[in-house]
Amino acid sequence: MPSSTEVIVLSSSSPDHIPSQTPAQSNYNPEKLFGLSPLSPSPPPLPSPSELFQPPTRSRFFKAQDEKAVVSSNTKQDSNTVAKANKPNATKRKAAASATGRSKKSKEDQTKGDTQTVIRGSNNALMKLDEEAPKKEPKARKKRSDAGVKRTLAKNRTITGKVAKSGSTQTDVTGLKAEEPVTFEPYLRKTDIEKAETRDIDDLQLDAAMKRRLDWTPTKDTRKQLVALDMVDGEPDQNRFGNLVSGYGYSNTSSDLEANSKRLEDGAATKRRRIELVESRVFPNVKHVLPDSARASKAPALEEKPNKRSKRITTLTGRVTALYVDDATDDSDSASAFTAAFGDVVNNASANRSSVQQRGKSSSRSHVIDSSVLPPEAAVSFLKEQDLVFGTCSQLEREDSPTMLRDMQMAIRASENDMTAEPKAYPATRPGSKFSDRATVSRFATPRKLWSVASRDLDGSLAQIEVLDMVNISKISELPLKSDDSPETAALTKGDTGYDAIETDTSFQEQSTTPAEKSPDDEKAVIKDPELSPPADCQLKEVVSKESAAPRIPQYAEFTDSQLSKEVKKFGFKSMRSRKKMVEVLEKCWESKHGATKAENQDMGKDIHAHQKAEPDTTRGQTKKRTRKTATLSETPKTRANPKIEPKASAHLKRRQAQEANEFSQASNSSFANVEEIEDSEDELIPSPSRLQNRYTLHSSETRGSQPLLVSDSPSSQERKNSESCIILSTFDAVAKPGMPDLSSQINKAVRAQPRSSSAGCKRPSWHEKILMYDPIILEDFATWLNTEGLGLVHEDREVSAGFLREWCESNGICCCFRKNNK
C-alpha cells in the first residue's frame, strides 16, 4: 500500500503558518527583490538622541524582528513557494559551489536563503507539484532564486533540524538533506556595531552633555559666596582711604580660597614638612576675633608648653621685608596658636608695640599692617627709623636674636653721639703752644678726626695738622680766628711749601690784649713773613685805608731800562749802566720829595707785590733747609730798614726799629727748638738761600751797619708786645732789595736770550736747547755761564751758585747733576 506523506514547510518568521495550496506567482518589485521598505512621500522623523544611544535589550531586539516580519509577510510566503519548486536547482548550486572552492560562509548563506522542507506524508497533489516544477524555465528561476537568495540575506532565520522519519520513501531527497544538515546562525552585524558604539558611550554621560548643549549660559561661580567672610567683623571704617588703596596692591593670596578654607577647617595646619624657602600656604585675609572665654582658656596652654619653632634659613630680603608681611607669611604650628598670639597682640599693641614687631619666636605676625599713603615728610622720617641689617646669611642665621642687633645699633649710635657732642681735646705740642683745644685746624675736619689722630709732632705727641690744598698751593692758608683774639694775634699756619709753623713765646701769648694806643708807625716799621702771614690783599687794604690820601711810590723795578733812564734824567742825574743803581736813586729821590713817612707805607705794599711773584717758584731744597734757615735767623736777627735813612725821619721811628729788633731776638731764642738734622755731605757744600741772598744782594749793608741804633727808654704797651709775638721776618725780605725782580725769572730770561753759537764749524746747542732735549745740565758749568754771560744779557748784576741752580732746575723739572769728583 502506498505510504502517505506530509509536507511541512518551516518558515523563520511564521512557523505556524502553512499554506494550504500553492500560491500564485506575484509580481516582483524593488521592495520585494532587495528587501527595502516602501518609500514614503514624507521623510521619516529623526530619532531622538536618547533613543539613538539606548543600550540594546532582548525585548527591543525581538520587537524589531516582529515588526519586520509583519511588513514583509507576503514576500516571505512567495519566497517559500519558489524555494520548494527549486529544490533540485539548490542541490546543483551546492555542488558547483563546492567545486569552485567557495568559502564555507558563502555556502551557509546560500543554504540560509533556501527554505527547509521535510516530506512526511504521501500527498499526491504535492508530489505532482514537485514533478512539474523542473518543467518550467529553469534558467529564469535560477536567476530569480539567486537574486532572491541574495536579497534575503539580511533576514533572520530560525534553526531547523532533520524531521524525516526512518521509513521515508524519498531516499534521494532525505539523503541529501541528511548529508548536509542546514543550521541557521542569526545575523547580528547591526547589533554588534551598536554594542561596540554603546560600550564607550555609557561612560560619557551624554544626557548631561545634551542638557549643557541646549543651555549655553555659563555656570555661576559659587566661590563668590566666600567674599562675605571678609565682612564678618563689620568694622565701621571699611570705606576709608587706606582700605581703598590697599585693594590695588598684590594681596599674595591664592585664587583657590576654597582649598585654603578646607585645609584649615580641621583647626590645625598640615603636618608635612615644607621644603620651599618661600611661604606657599597663605592664610585668608580675615581678622580672627576670639571670645574672651576661648582666649582665656587657650592662653594658659601656650604658657605651659611653648611652641618649638624649627630653625630655618633667613635672608637679608626676608629680614628687611619682615615688617611689611601680612599675617599669613609666617609659620604657625597650629591654628589655635595663631589665634591666641593674635589675641595677645591686640590687647598689648599700645604698650609693647616695638617688642611685638621684633618678636622672633612668635608663631605668627601679630599685627595687621594697613597700607596707607604718608606725606613726604612723614615718609622720610619713617625711613630714617628703620633698622637695616647687614651681614652674610650665615651670620644672620647664627645671630637670630633681633634684640641683640637692636642693642648693637643703639650702642653704635650712642658712641657716635658722644664723639660729636664732646670732641676729645688732643694734647698740644708744648705748654706754650699756640694750638688751643677749641681751635679746629683742619679745613676738612670730620667728627671723628681720624687723620688728625694719626699726626704727631717732633716730640712724639699728637698734634693737629692742617690739610693742605695741593691744587691751589699758591694761596696762603689761614687758621680760623678765636672769638677773643684780634687779627694781629691770630695763629699762623705753615706756608705753601709745607714748613712747620713757627711758634712764639709763651709770655706773649698769655698776655691779654687791650685796645690800643697804637700808632701807625708801629705797623709800618716791620713786615710780616708773606708765607706765614695773612693774605697780602688784607695787608694792602689796611695800608691803603690808613694812607689813602698819600701818593704811592712808583714800582721802578718793573720799569724798562729806557723808562728808568728817562726818570733818572728828570731828577737831574746822568744815565747809569747798572739797572739796580738807577732804581735805588729813583726811590731815594722820590722819598726825599714826598717824605720818609709816606715812603714807608708804599714800600710795604711794594714788598708784598714783589714777594707774590716769587711765591710760585718754591722748591724742595727750600723745604729741606727750612730748619737751618730758622736757626740762622735766630742767631743773626736783622731788622729791615731803608738803605739810607733821611734826616727827615723821626727819632720815634728809629727807637721803634731798635726795640723791635731786640724783642724779636728774644722771642726767637725762646720759641725755636734747635733741632739737629743729619744732612748729606752734598748738602753741606750747598749754601742756603739766605746765605746766597746775603752774598749777592746786600749792597747797602755797610751803610746800614754804620747807623747807630737808638734805644727808647719808654716801655712799649702790652698790645705792641702781643702783636709782635706773631710777627716773623722772612729771610728773603730781610736781605733782598725791595723792588728787585725774582732771580728765578731772571734766569729764565737769560736762558732764552742766549744766542746760538758755533765753533770750528760745529754747532753747539744753547742751554735752552739742552733743556728741551733733556740733556743733563752740569750745575757748575751752568752757574759759570750765568755769572759771566747769561745774567748780563738781562742786565742782572747778581750772581748765582750751583746749589741755587739745582733748586731752580728741580722746581722746573730740568735734569741736572753735579760734576763728578775723581778724588
Curated annotation (Swiss-Prot):
Question: Which named protein is this?
Answer: Structure-specific endonuclease subunit slx4
Lineage top rank: taxon: Eukaryota
Q: What is its main location?
A: nucleus
What the record says about family reads:
Belongs to the SLX4 family.
Question: What function is annotated for this protein?
Answer: Regulatory subunit of the slx1-slx4 structure-specific endonuclease that resolves DNA secondary structures generated during DNA repair and recombination. Has endonuclease activity towards branched DNA substrates, introducing single-strand cuts in duplex DNA close to junctions with ss-DNA.
- Provide one Gene Ontology biological process annotation: DNA repair
Extract one GO cellular component term from the record: Slx1-Slx4 complex
Stretches with biased composition (Low complexity)? 1-14
Compartments where located: Nucleus
User: How does this chain assemble?
Assistant: Forms a heterodimer with slx1.
